[in-house]
Amino acid sequence: MYQSKGKHFSLILIIMAVIAAVLPQSLFAQGESAVPFLLIAPNARADGMGEAGGALADDASAAFWNPAALAFLPGQEISLTHSNWLPAFQQSDLFYDYLSYRNNMENIGGTISASVTYLSLGEFVITQDDPTPLGTFKGYELAVTAGYATRAFDDLGLGINLRYIHSSLAPIDVQQQGREGVASSVSFDVAALWKPKSLGPLEDRLSIGLNLSNLGPKMTYIDAAQADPLPTNLRLGIAAQIIKSEFNNVNFVVDFARLLVRRYPSDTVKDAQGGIVSISDPRVDDLPKSLFSAWGDHAFDKVTIGTGIEYWYGAPKLIALRFGYFYENPQFGNRKFLTFGAGVRYDVYGFDFSYLSAVEENHPLGETLRFTLLIAWGQ
């Protein structure tokens, strides 16, 4: 028997079921995909605009939203984001951290980046049935990413990321199947960002980004037959600077994202009397087939939409206010929330925070706060 700070081990099942609220997940990721933590918005700025950052990615967090955007950024920057994750569970040791760094290097003709994503699932107590404590373990998930971006043309940036993923849900054989709840994999991202230089009134005001992320082999917790795909995700982002003046600037952003995972339901074999003879494991398409077959499963109904607006005051930019909205089809996750945010910039320092207000009452993501600190120099 396993307990987390006095609560039954089944709590971790619930936590994993709503992490990132992608789709229901069981302990060993028997839902739409494994490691959904890779889809969590990693910075307060984009989160304050409805989790839309695919085109307005002009800081170190671009390594997540669109690594190609790093090709347009001079100098160096380091940023750190922290969030107490799923505050409805009131677990102080359930948190999310994201550390990122970028450096534009003229001698290699582009920008290098590195980031670390860490999700703590908390500490759990191993007990006997009486229950006598036998020990503890901590569940966590980790990703380490390195990237490179360069300009193919003056108005077109290209980027790539390479990533190592480690998931340690339980370093013990919870399901008594001879395997621990631990798995690792690798993945890569490819991205492009277009910033047109000659579009009349939209010159230097429009950005269009495309990012295909988390391409890689499946995660295997139990055995190869039960392996689950990574959350391969396609993101299209559009950003426009709708007001541009010396002291007042307004940005509008919208992102469309689609999980490119195709899972088929289990096949049930029945006898002549209608009794169940066997149930097969769900079938999942491998890459690259899933990049295309996923669209055969409610093609556009599974597209999520995030949109927002950002107002900056100051010359240079000093104070920002942000507002956004995120929508997901009720049949495929039903995430609907408003987001609010603010930020300040002074010299090389910056601070952003965001607040998520879920439309659905008592949603696990409701009242989520993110805080981001950043330092940028050599601009």
Predicted regions and their residues:
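N-terminal secretory signal peptides that target proteins for export/translocation
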Residues: 1-9
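Short N-terminal leader segment in a subset of presequences, especially plant chloroplast
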Residues: 8-12, 39-40
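Bacterial N-terminal signal peptides
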Residues: 12-24
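Subset of outer-membrane beta-barrel
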Residues: 28-379
